[in-house]
């Protein structure tokens, strides 16, 4: 388990490129036949990926010991979105078939967590966010057909994008975790611009659907102290509450956003005008 400490905004603005990447970038999300796990002190979120190829992958008691409990979800909830081939997640003996861009919410108290791919040649890529939970909500599958896509932006400003809200109160109950998937239209490059911060939640982005010769310049920092991190395909970035989180790519891309914190009000954000950025 890779543990990332919290960092003050005054400290963050003094960091060079390497230090910024060390603090906020998660470079390796998917590793064959393993799970990856990054524990952030910021709102205690855990972020990672699971890619079964030649055999199933189980998250067992070894993780619980690192969290001071018996199992990962003794005091946590888990949200998973599959960005790879078809697979399944077995929760306490119950199999849930999870296809490409299907998602599964797993509530507090689940013990057995086993992840499998249907085909080794096209393995599932289970990306997950995990957050502290105060009560148990039912495990539930969410497919793209269950979410109401919202298209925002304009081709003229290169920010036309479709937002798919998977884990939000209108779709299912969670303790604090929100997750969704945003896809840029072809030829569009900007996400979340004009940008914002939200004092009551932190956020993590996973960028994917990127070609090998492309990248995203992820914008972060306080609005008057902006920095950037160069992102490649299937990499994630941690965004503290005080930081903007926006990006511009060399080509169109897709990203998954996950939020934890004080509330789940999607529009609870502090907007930043473009002319106020520095």
From Swiss-Prot:
Function text: Catalyzes the isomerization of 5-dehydro-4-deoxy-D-glucuronate to 3-deoxy-D-glycero-2,5-hexodiulosonate.
Organism: Salmonella newport (strain SL254)
EC number of this enzyme: 5.3.1.17
UniProtKB keywords: Isomerase, Metal-binding, Zinc
Presence of the UniProt keyword Isomerase in the record: yes
Binding site residues for Zn(2+): 196, 198, 203, 245
Cofactor, free-text remark: Binds 1 zinc ion per subunit.
InterPro entries given in the database record: KduI, KduI/IolB_isomerase, KduI_N, RmlC-like_jellyroll, RmlC_Cupin_sf
GO terms for MF: 4-deoxy-L-threo-5-hexosulose-uronate ketol-isomerase activity; zinc ion binding
Name of protein: 4-deoxy-L-threo-5-hexosulose-uronate ketol-isomerase
Cofactor(s) demanded: Zn(2+)
Pfam family of the protein (one): KduI
GO terms of biological process kind: D-galacturonate catabolic process; D-glucuronate catabolic process; pectin catabolic process
Reactions mediated catalytically: 5-dehydro-4-deoxy-D-glucuronate = 3-deoxy-D-glycero-2,5-hexodiulosonate
Magnesium listed as a keyword: no
Family under the similarity heading: Belongs to the KduI family.
Pathway: Glycan metabolism; pectin degradation; 2-dehydro-3-deoxy-D-gluconate from pectin: step 4/5
